[in-house]
Amino acid sequence: MKLKRNMLFMALASASLMMVGSVHAQTAAAADSQDQSMTAKEREAKRKAEAAEKAKSLDVVEVTGIRRGIESAINLKQESTSIIEAVSAEDIGKLPDSSIAESIARLPGLAAQRVAGRATTISIRGLAGDFSTTLLNGREQVSSGDNRGVEFDQYPSELLSSVVVYKTPDANLVAQGISGTVDLQTVRPLSLGKRVVSLNARYEKNSTGEVNPGYDDTGYRISASYIDQFADNTIGVALGFARLDSPGQTERWNAWGYETQTIGGQSAEFLTGSQIYGTSTSNVRDGLMAVIEWAPSDTYSGALDIYYSQFERVETTRGLEVGLFPAWTGSTLANPVVAGGLLQSATLNSIRPVLRNDENKRDDDIFAIGFKNEFTFSDYWTGMADFSMSKANRDESILETYAGAAGRDNVNVTVDRNGFPTFDFGLDYTDPATIQLRDPGGWGQDGYVKYPEFEDKLTSARFTLSRAFDSATFSGIDFGANWSKRTKSRAVAEAFLDLRNGRAPASIPSDLLVGSVNTGFAGVPGVISYNVGEAFRTLYQTRTNINQDILNKDWEVDETVITSFAKLNIDGMLGNVPVRGNLGVSYVSADQESEGFAVPGGNASGAQPFKAGTDYGDVLPSLNLIFSLTDEQTVRFGAAKQVSRPRMDQMRANNGFGIDTTRREWSGGGGNPELEPWRATSFDLSYEYYLFGGKGYVSAAAFHKDLKSYIYDQTVEFDFSVFDLSGFTANVPPSTIGRFTRPTNGEGGSINGWEFAFSVPFGEIAPVLDGFGILGSYSDTRSAVRPLGPGTSQPLPGLSRYVSNVTAYYERGGFSTRISQRSRSAFIGEIQGFGADRETRYIEGEKLVDFQVGYAFGGEWDGLSVILQVNNVTNEAYQEFYRDSGRIDRPRSYNEYGRTYLLGATYKF
C-alpha cells in the first residue's frame, strides 16, 4: 500500500509537471549562422562566459538558502558532460542535511542503509557500495569499513561544498565503479573570491531518553569555517573544523531463528530464542579540512588539500537473551496460540535467560592529502600533475559478559510481526541478590572479547595533458595516466573470558552496580546493569581462542592499478542541434596479491603462511553525448564498458584444506586472491527539461547494465600442491587435484531501471506562490543477477526495487521551512554479524521523514540565522526478517532509534 501511494504521488507529480512544462515551453529556433560557424573552442569559451554571467546575475538577486543549494545543483547537472546528480551547499558550511549520507540518499536512484539509526552506506541504482567508488576532490578514498565501500558518516557535511554522483563514466575520471562514482568536494577559496567566516552550533536531543545508565540523551554539534584570499588574490586559504558529539539510543529485539513445528494439528513457525537489548552510544567525531591554493601566474596554479577525521564510538548494550525451543533448552510449552502460520503466543516453563552487559569501542581515523598542479603551456596545451595519499585505521574492542539466576524461570511470550514482542518473566532480573556473574547458557565461557583491526592505505599519482582544437566538431583531447598502490589488512585477536575464581559464579560487587537498563519496550521492567569495563579488568581472566575461523580474519591484500586513458572532447553541430560530450578509452591493468594462512585439517596451530595473486587488464571505451534540442531541453546518451574491483575479504588468501575420506580426494575452501573484477556494459538515456532559466527542471532517465560476470561461491577443480601436504599420512589421495570452494567469477545478468526527477519553484508559475517549491524523484530498478549463483532466488544486495524522495519547502523574507521524505522498498543489506564478520540480511522497506524550520536575520543582525530540525519525525523502525522459499516471512529484528531534535544558530560574516 505504501508503494502504491508513492507511485500515485509520482504519477500526479508527473502530470502536474507536464502542464508546467507546456505553459513555459517555447518553440525552438534554429541556431543562427554565426553559432554554426564557430569552432568548438569558440563555442566552449562562449558557454563559459554565459555561465559566468548567469552566476553573476544570481549574485545580484542574492539567491540564498534552500533555493541557492537547489539552483547550484541544477547548474552542475546542466553543465556536466556526464549524467550526474548533485548536492550543493546552501551556504558556507551548510549542506541540506546534518549527515552527508542523508543528503546523498535524497538524489534520484540512490538509497541509504541505516546502521544504529544513522545513514552510513549508499546504494546507487540498486547496487551496493562495493560497486561504487568514492573520491575526495577527484581522488580515490580508502575505507575504514570491511571492504571498499566508504562509510559516509566519516565525512562531516559542514566541511563539504558539494557532492557530485557520476552515473555514466568519463575516461579521465579516477577509479570509476559500475554503479557510479561519488565525488565529495571541498570549497575552492580562490573561486569564492571573498573572505568568509562561518560559525555554527547546534544542541541535539534524542526522544528515546536515557536507555542505559551513564549515557546522556543530549549532545551537540559545532563547526567553524574560514575562507580568505591574499597577495592580490593569488593565494587562497580555506580552513574548517567540525565536531559531532551525538547520543544514540536504541531499543532492540532480535530473533535466534525459527523451527517449523506441528502444534495442535497446525504447522507453525516456532521462535527458538530472543534477544532483548537496550543500546546506548556515544558518537564523537572531529573533522578537519584545509585547502591552500596558489595561482601566481596565468601559467600555473596549485592546490594542497588536507582532510582528517577521527570518529570514536563507545557503545554499551545491556539486556538478556533466552532460548525458547524445547528441544534445545529442555523447556516445556503451554497455552500455545497459532495465527497465520506463526506461534503467536505461549508460555515456556523452565527456561534460563542469559543476562548480557556488553561494551563495544570503535576508533576510526581517516587522513587524506593531495597536491594538484595545473600548467598552461600555450593557448592550446595544458597539463596537470596530482599526487595524493589516503589512509584509514580502525581499532575495535567487542566485549561480552554474562550473568543469570541460579535457577530456572518461566515466561509468557507474545510475538508481534511488526513491532516488539512482549515477555513476562517470573523473576526480577534487576535484583542483585538474585543475579550472579556466571555461564547460565552452558556455553563454556563467562564472556568473550574480540579486537578487530583494519588498516587501509592508498597512494596515487596522476598526469594529464590536454590539447585544445580549432575544430568545428572537437574542442580538444585529454590523455594521461593514473598510478595507484593500495594495501588493506585485517587482523583480530579473540579470547574467552573466565571468572577468576575457577569460573565459579560470583556476586556482582556493589561498587560496580549502576542501576538497570530500560527494556520496558519488550515488557521486561529492566535488567541489572554494571560497569562492564571495570568488571572485565578486575573479575575476569582471558583464555586465547585460536581456530580456523579466527585465522580467516587475518589477511592482507596488495594491489597496484595503472590506468592510461585518452578522451576526445566533442563540441559540434548535428544539423541545427548543438552536440557536446566525449569519446574516450581507458586501459586498466591490475596486479594483486594477498597474504594469509592456510589451515590443514582444521588444525589452527599448524597454519601455514600462504600467498597468491594474479594480474589482468581491461580496455574500457566510453561515450557521452549531450544533444541541446533547445535552450531548455537536453537529451543525454551514455555507453561504456565498466569494471568494479572485487571485495577485499573475498580476495583474501586464507583457506582451509584436508582430505575428503568419502571421495578420497583433497578438498577445501577459502578466499580467492585470483579474483578478477565485476565487468559490465552499460547504456544510459536521459531527457532533461530545464525550467525558468535553470531554476527548476524535469528529467526522465533509463539505464541498462549487463553484468558479464558476478562473483559468488563455486566449487572448482584445484591443485592442492600449492600447499604443504606433508602433515597428512593416512588415506592420502593419489592425486593433488581436488575440489575447492571459493568466490569465483561466474555468470552475471542484467540490471534495468528508470528514474524520474523534478524540481519546481512555484513562484515562477504564480507570484502569489513565491517562496514555495517542491523537488523529488522516483526510481524503479529490476535485476536478473543471481548473487548466489544460477538457480538461486536471493536478490542483489543493496537493491530496492522502488526508491523515492520528495521535499516540499517554503523560503521567503528570511523565514524557511522544509519537510522531506525518503523511502525505499525491502532489500538485502549487510550488517556486522557474529564474530565481527559481514552478514547479509533481508531488511524491510522504510520511510524516513525529516523536518526543519529556520529564520535568517537581516539588518544589524545580518549573517545570523537560527534553525530547528527534527530527524526521523515518525520514529520509523528498522526491521529485518527471514525469507525462505516455501515458508512465511518471519520477523528477525525490530529496532527503534527515536527522533533527533536539533536546535542551533549560524553566524557568518
Regions found by a protein language model. Name each.
Residues L76, A101-E140, K167:
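Extracytoplasmic beta-strand/coil segments of soluble accessory domains associated
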Residues V60-L95, T121, G129-S132, R139:
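N-terminal periplasmic "start-of-domain" segments of outer-membrane beta-barrel proteins
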Residues N501, D706, S823-E830, Y855-F909:
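C-terminal beta-signal and adjacent terminal beta-strands/loops
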Residues H704-D706, F723-Q832, G904-T906:
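Gram-negative outer-membrane beta-barrel transporters
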Residues L173, P189-V196, A231-I235, T299, ...:
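Short loop/turn motifs that connect adjacent beta-strands in outer-membrane beta-barrel proteins
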Residues G214-W328, P336-V338, K361-K372, P621-L623:
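Transmembrane beta-barrel wall of Gram-negative outer-membrane proteins
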Residues R139-K167, D217, A224:
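Short acidic/polar hinge/loop motifs at secondary-structure boundaries
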Residues I351, L355-I366, K553-V557, V643-L707, ...:
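Outer-membrane beta-barrel signature, preferentially recognizing the C-terminal barrel domain
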